[in-house]
Amino acid sequence: MLPESFGGRIIYLLQQYGPSFLKGAGVSMWLALVGTLFGCIIGFLVGIVQTIPVDKNDSTAKKVIIKVVKFIMACYVEFFRGTPMMAQAMFIYFGSAYLFNINMSMWFAAIFIVSINTGAYMAETVRGGILSIDPG
């Protein structure tokens, strides 16, 4: 039976659901920490690769490869920065199972989604930071 007062209801809810809430908060913090760690690694790599200069003296093959890789990475950054993370999660977790018959665990999917989303934002931050340095 719920108590009548607001404070009594809060205490009742904390007694009933407090342990579950704390467990969920811990899992969320773990997921955020691991996903952000992997996302930072992805972001640093993508951001650095996006700033590789193409010199006039480079071979044609090298120029083409660098431009194609930069284009793919720019598409990755724009797509994952431009769509909501929840839509990405739904598509990756449910869409991969439906379209490609890939059944991944919910933990792998969660870490993967947070990592690639964070990586896209971090890549743009790293790229912008590198390009803001005066060539002097």
Regions from the language model: what does each represent?
Residues 1-135:
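Transmembrane alpha-helices and adjacent helix-loop boundaries
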